Each structure stands twice: as structure tokens, then as C-alpha cells.
Amino acid sequence: MAKKVTAQVKLQIPAGKATPAPPVGTALGPQGVNIMDFCKAYNAKTSGKDQEGLIIPVVITIYSDRSFTFITKTPPVPVLIKRAVAIAKGSPEPHKTKVGKITQAQVEEIAKIKLPDLNCFDLDAAMRSVRGTARSMGVDVV
């Protein structure tokens, strides 16, 4: 018989840097989950040179016996764009002030990374979505 799901918690945590402090502790504490077990498992799964400094979304499923499973997603598109362009944040006035440029090759690479988590089925639609996000951040697509 399957375990009964009591809650599903969605968080965005830096890769390899989950700690019992907020936001992890405040989200999992009321559910009765062992926070340190989650932090150790998450940090073990997300630690690595390729994910260093990225924010990784995670969906934690909590069961009635206080056990849990979690699924990590791909980093948000704005985080990948900021990493590709090497900027700290997007433009406060995106259509007036541009903060950087991104190439079509970089857009395609980001779209390939995000394709499993996006609600589109082909690479062209994913690239259009990434280009739109870049434009709304004040990044020129060249």
C-alpha cells in the first residue's frame, strides 16, 4: 500500500547550501520532517562544480509517516541568463537600459537545459521563451 502524502513543499535553494535556517527550516519544521536529513540529502545531490552558485528549485513530497522524497528541477531561466552574461541582476528599465548581450548559441544552450521543465515541446518554442525572458531583463539577444 502506498504512503499517504500529507504535503508538498516547493523551495528554491542555492545548490549545495541548504541549512536548517530559513527558508528550509520554516517550510519543513511545521511538517515534522527531520530538517538535517533533508539538508544532507539535498546538499549531496546538488553539490558539484557545474551547479556551484546556482539556485535549484526543489519539490519536497512529505508523507504521513514524516518521511520525504524530493525532486530537483533545473535552475530558473533568469539565473541561467545572469550566469551566461555575467551580471548580478537585470535592468530596472529593461526597454531603455540594456545590461548585456547574449548570443543565439547561449540562448539555445539555456533552452536545452530548461526544456524538460518548460511547458513547451520543441526547442524553438523554448528558445522563444528564453529570448523573451532575456528581453524582459534588459539583455539584448544578438
Curated annotation (Swiss-Prot):
Record Pfam families: Ribosomal_L11, Ribosomal_L11_N
Alphabetized CDD domains for the sequence: Ribosomal_L11
Keywords annotated in UniProt: Methylation, Ribonucleoprotein, Ribosomal protein, RNA-binding, rRNA-binding
GO cellular component, one term: cytosolic large ribosomal subunit
Cystine pairs: none
Free-text description of this protein's post-translational modifications in UniProt: One or more lysine residues are methylated.
A GO MF label: large ribosomal subunit rRNA binding
InterPro entries: Ribosomal_uL11, Ribosomal_uL11_bac-typ, Ribosomal_uL11_C, Ribosomal_uL11_C_sf, Ribosomal_uL11_N, Ribosomal_uL11_N_sf
Record Gene3D superfamilies: Ribosomal protein L11, C-terminal domain (1.10.10.250), Ribosomal protein L11/L12, N-terminal domain (3.30.1550.10)
GO BP: translation
Transmembrane parts of this sequence: none
Quaternary structure and partners: Part of the ribosomal stalk of the 50S ribosomal subunit. Interacts with L10 and the large rRNA to form the base of the stalk. L10 forms an elongated spine to which L12 dimers bind in a sequential fashion forming a multimeric L10(L12)X complex.
Summary of the function given for this chain in its UniProt record: Forms part of the ribosomal stalk which helps the ribosome interact with GTP-bound translation factors.
Similarity comment: Belongs to the universal ribosomal protein uL11 family.
Protein name per the record: Large ribosomal subunit protein uL11
Species this protein is from: Solibacter usitatus (strain Ellin6076)
Upper taxonomic lineage: Bacteria, Pseudomonadati, Acidobacteriota, Terriglobia, Bryobacterales
Gene from which the chain derives: rplK
